[in-house]
Structure formats: C-alpha cells, structure tokens
C-alpha cells in the first residue's frame, strides 16, 4: 500500500512538472508570436521593449491568469454541485457577469470608471452562482441542474442581445464583440484586475482538504465534520469573483472550465491537492495556446478567443456527454 501511494505521489509530481514546462513554453511562444516574430535575443532591443514588454507581456499575463481562474472555477463548481458537467460558461455564470457589466454601462451612460464595471461584472456572476446553488440544494438530478444552468445562460444572453440591439451607444455595441472573448485591448492599465485574481487563485489552490470532502458528496462531507454552509458560500463567492474578474478582463470564454478538469481527472489527477494546481497550469497553457491561434489565424485581423475555445472545446464536450450517458 505504501509503495502504491509513493508511486501515485511521484506520478502526480511528474504531471505537475510536465504542466509547468508546458506553461513556460506557451508563455515564451506567446511573447515571441505576432505579426512580427521577436525572438528572446531581441527582447531588449528598442523594438522588443515596445512589442514585448509594453504590448505582449500584459496580454500574456492576463491570458495566463484568466485561463488558470476559469479552469479552477470549473473544478470548484464540479465539486460544489456534485456535477461533472458544471462549468462557469455552460451554467450561465459568465453570461451573468456580462449582464452585470452591460447593465452598468446602460445605467451609468458610459461614464462609470473601469473598476466600477469590473465590480458589476463580479456581482452579476455571483448572483447567477447563488441561484444555481439554490437549485443544487433542491437535490435536482444532474440533467435538470444542467438544464437549469443552460436556461439561465440563455436568459442572460437574451438580455445582453436586447440591450445591445436597442442601444445607440457605440461603446455598448463594441461590447458584443468583447463578449465573444478577446484580449486585444488588455494593457498595463488592467493590471489591477490581474492583481485581483492572484490572491483568490492562491487561496483556492490551498483548499484541497474541504474540496476533497465536498467531492465525496454532501452526506459524507457532513459526517467528516465539514461545515457545508460556510464552505459552499465561501467557494461560491470565490468562484463568482474569479469568473467576474475574468469576464471584466477578456469577456466570456467557454469550455476551459469544463474540459481541463475532465482531462486531468482522466489522467489520474483526482486528488484536489494535485488537481487544483494542475488545473491552474493546464488552464493557463490551454488559453495561451488558444490566444496564439487567435492572433495568428488571420493575417490582418484577430479571431475572438471565445470562438477558438468553443471550436476546440465543443467536440470534447460532446464526447464527455456521450461518455457520461453510457
């Protein structure tokens, strides 16, 4: 038994090391890639200081943090709702953040500062997450809870479409493209949003013990002495915060929170002591690679990153649905 435990521990360490190397390679590629490829040897030239340090570095850091936040949010929601298909985008949390942001633009008539828009996006994500938690407490089946989340997402999407369609504000119309997901407008002025993600990410990665208990189910967690009400509300707040900040930074980006935790579990990373940091590393790597594809796919334009992640993630999601139905 001890030998098996040591083998599993070594395998987990190897996975985390591989994911760390993958993330570093994706980060370096993201700093080099663009209309003008700039190799590391030219990073400190006048051209490199402009393109790498002023334009690409803040964007790359934002992509890295948002990818980590979305993947960890997916893992947390799957444990919270005891639902392997739970994910911020699929359950409407990302769209809720978008509704909060668009409501702030409408009510503030475009005069609100960026920090206020970010807080409204966070509030919208929290409201949808709390509604989903109320549904989960009614012991709905997996399929019904999933349908409830999809319905909430459709309602939020409809509200955003109506608001944008009837608006005469140029800023609000530009939000429609922004809600498809993209990091094109990110620079050092959004560094406060990046900093707002870091402490929550680090805190959740340290909460493997209650997460492992939650993954066992509500009855088992209670028997083990876990204060369910406290941890559910704290994790809901943390998840809503991460999703809201991510939407404020880059718009709605789907499938990262669904696919990454599933792939890691299939690879044997079921313990949240390894799964949570693994999700952070894999989510950051996946979104960095998707952002590189979005930047390089078209010569004179940039694809919305939400389109890239949906194109790559939708087939995986269908496969997971078929596998869950067997």
From Swiss-Prot:
GO MF terms, alphabetically ordered: vitamin transmembrane transporter activity
Chief subcellular site? membrane
Q: Which Gene3D superfamilies match?
A: ABC transporter involved in vitamin B12 uptake, BtuC (1.10.3470.10)
**How is this protein positioned relative to the membrane?**
Multi-pass membrane protein
Biological process (GO) annotations held by this record are:
cobalamin transport
Q: Which GO terms describe its cellular component?
A: plasma membrane
Quote the subcellular location field of this record: Cell inner membrane
User: Which Pfam families does its entry note?
Assistant: FecCD (PF01032)
Q: Which UniProt keywords apply?
A: Cell inner membrane, Cell membrane, Membrane, Transmembrane, Transmembrane helix, Transport
Tell me the protein family, please. Belongs to the binding-protein-dependent transport system permease family. FecCD subfamily.
Function per UniProt: Part of the ABC transporter complex BtuCDF involved in vitamin B12 import. Involved in the translocation of the substrate across the membrane.
Cite the record's note on assembly: The complex is composed of two ATP-binding proteins (BtuD), two transmembrane proteins (BtuC) and a solute-binding protein (BtuF).
User: What is the protein's given name?
Assistant: Vitamin B12 import system permease protein BtuC
Taxonomy, top ranks, is: Bacteria, Pseudomonadati, Pseudomonadota, Gammaproteobacteria, Enterobacterales
């Amino acid at each position: 038994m001890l030998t098996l435990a040591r083998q599993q521990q070594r395998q987990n360490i190897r996975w985390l090391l591989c994911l760390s190397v993958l993330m570093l390679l994706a980060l370096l590629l993201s700093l080099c890639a663009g209309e003008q490829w700039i190799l590391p040897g030219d990073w400190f030239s006048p051209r490199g200081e402009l393109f790498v340090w002023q334009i690409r570095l803040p964007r790359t850091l934002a992509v890295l943090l948002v990818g980590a936040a979305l993947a960890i949010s997916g893992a947390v929601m799957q444990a919270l709702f005891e639902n392997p298909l739970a994910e911020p985008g699929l359950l409407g949390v990302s769209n809720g953040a978008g509704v909060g942001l668009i409501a702030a633009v409408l009510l503030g008539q475009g005069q609100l500062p960026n920090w206020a828009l970010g807080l409204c996006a966070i509030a919208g994500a929290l409201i949808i997450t709390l509604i989903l938690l109320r549904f989960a407490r009614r012991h709905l089946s997996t399929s019904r809870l999933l349908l409830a989340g999809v319905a909430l997402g459709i309602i939020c999407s409809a509200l955003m479409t109506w608001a944008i369609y009837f608006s005469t504000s140029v800023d609000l119309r530009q939000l429609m493209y922004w809600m498809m997901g993209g990091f094109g407008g990110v620079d050092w002025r959004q560094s406060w949003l990046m900093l707002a993600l870091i402490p929550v990410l680090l805190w959740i990665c340290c909460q493997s013990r209650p997460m492992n208990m939650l993954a066992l189910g509500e009855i088992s967690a209670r028997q083990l002495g876990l204060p369910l009400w406290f941890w559910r509300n704290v994790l809901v707040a943390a998840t809503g915060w991460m999703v809201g900040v991510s939407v404020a930074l880059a718009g709605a980006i789907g499938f990262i929170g669904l696919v990454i935790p599933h792939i890691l579990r299939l690879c044997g990373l079921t313990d949240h002591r390894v799964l949570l940091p693994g999700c952070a590393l894999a989510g950051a790597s996946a979104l960095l690679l998707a952002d590189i594809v979005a930047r390089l796919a078209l010569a004179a334009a940039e694809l919305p990153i939400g389109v890239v992640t949906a194109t790559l993630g939708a087939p995986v999601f269908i496969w997971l649905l078929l596998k869950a139905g067997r």
